[in-house]
């Protein structure tokens, strides 16, 4: 398939790890994060990539890093391959548009999730308990309802499998009171600002996941920010309370895999071309809407 980067191999550069989507290298005092076109579903990486997906994720992150830089510093050093240290400029053709040279921060062991609407695992929790992550919500809310106020619902990072939702009290035990309060405050501020920007463009940010780390003793924003892989974006025009919403993400892929009754165990099946093209179009569409 044209223009699909499933994996990078940068000779002479130390590969630290391959995540579900990103290849992470170490160079001098920095990390190089390369977003490939890999796509995962149900925690399994699929053999088929989505053209340009890595570039779109990177460009959306850069857009949001710039928009919230008044709230918190981030890990970006440069996204211009010509400015990367040697021998990286030689790989410009692969790296351009899909990579970031970043500060080597120490990641917090907690993922910071903010929910403004009731959806996904939050909706499931609410149906069972009337709460999300130990936060009591008003009675009688329906699926996709806007919450009275956005809520901070952290989770622990799982190396394998699903992340586990935790309460704020548990977050304090893991991070300490000061850091826990700070990431909560920063996460909510970022979400509120981004939600206002997106809404003006006809997009609802239902929920999103962010990551923070320490760099030289200072808390900074790391990883990706407000992308279709880390957030649920809905169309404001098509929003209907009480129902599941269409998201600008890989839902088309998940729906297809459910329809063929795949057992969710590796190896995953190949995706047909029409599913790949439709998914690529969803990613391109949200990029165009947000950055226009």
Curated annotation (Swiss-Prot):
Pathway: Purine metabolism; IMP biosynthesis via de novo pathway; 5-amino-1-(5-phospho-D-ribosyl)imidazole-4-carboxamide from 5-amino-1-(5-phospho-D-ribosyl)imidazole-4-carboxylate: step 1/2. The keyword Thylakoid does not apply. Signal peptide: none annotated. It catalyses: 5-amino-1-(5-phospho-D-ribosyl)imidazole-4-carboxylate + L-aspartate + ATP = (2S)-2-[5-amino-1-(5-phospho-beta-D-ribosyl)imidazole-4-carboxamido]succinate + ADP + phosphate + 2 H(+). One of its GO terms (biological process) is 'de novo' IMP biosynthetic process. PROSITE patterns: SAICAR_SYNTHETASE_1 (PS01057). It is an enzyme of class 6 (ligase). Transmembrane segments: none annotated. Pfam families: SAICAR_synt. It comes from the Bacteria. Keywords: ATP-binding, Ligase, Nucleotide-binding, Purine biosynthesis. Its EC number is 6.3.2.6. GO terms for molecular function: ATP binding; phosphoribosylaminoimidazolesuccinocarboxamide synthase activity. Belongs to the SAICAR synthetase family. This is Phosphoribosylaminoimidazole-succinocarboxamide synthase. It comes from Thermodesulfovibrio yellowstonii (strain ATCC 51303 / DSM 11347 / YP87). The gene is purC.
């Amino acid at each position: 398939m044209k223009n699909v980067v499933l994996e990078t191999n940068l000779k002479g550069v130390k590969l630290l790890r391959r995540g579900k989507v990103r290849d992470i290298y170490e160079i001098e005092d920095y990390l190089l994060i390369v977003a490939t076109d890999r796509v995962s579903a149900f925690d399994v990486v699929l053999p088929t990539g989505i053209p340009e997906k890595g570039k779109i994720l990177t460009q959306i992150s850069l857009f949001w890093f710039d928009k919230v830089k008044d709230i918190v510093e981030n890990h970006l050093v440069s996204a211009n391959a010509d400015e990367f240290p040697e021998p990286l400029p030689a790989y410009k053709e692969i790296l351009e548009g899909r990579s970031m040279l970043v500060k080597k921060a120490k990641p917090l062991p907690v993922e910071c999730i903010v929910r403004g609407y009731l959806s996904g695992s939050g909706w499931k929790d609410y149906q069972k308990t009337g709460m999300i992550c130990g936060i009591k919500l008003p009675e009688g809310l329906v699926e996709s309802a806007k919450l009275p106020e956005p809520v901070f619902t952290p989770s622990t990072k799982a190396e394998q499998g699903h992340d586990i939702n935790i309460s704020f009290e548990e977050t304090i035990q893991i991070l300490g009171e000061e850091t826990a309060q700070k990431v909560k405050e920063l996460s909510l501020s970022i979400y509120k600002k981004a939600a206002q920007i997106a809404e003006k463009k006809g997009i609802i940010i239902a929920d999103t996941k962010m990551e923070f780390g320490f760099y030289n003793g200072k808390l900074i924003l790391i990883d990706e920010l407000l992308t279709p892989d880390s957030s649920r974006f809905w169309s404001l025009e098509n929003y209907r309370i009480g129902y599941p919403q269409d998201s600008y993400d890989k839902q088309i892929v998940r729906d297809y895999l459910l329809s063929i009754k795949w057992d969710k165990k590796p190896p995953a099946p190949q995706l047909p071309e029409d599913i790949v093209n439709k998914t690529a179009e969803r990613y391109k569409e949200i990029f165009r809407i947000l950055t226009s």
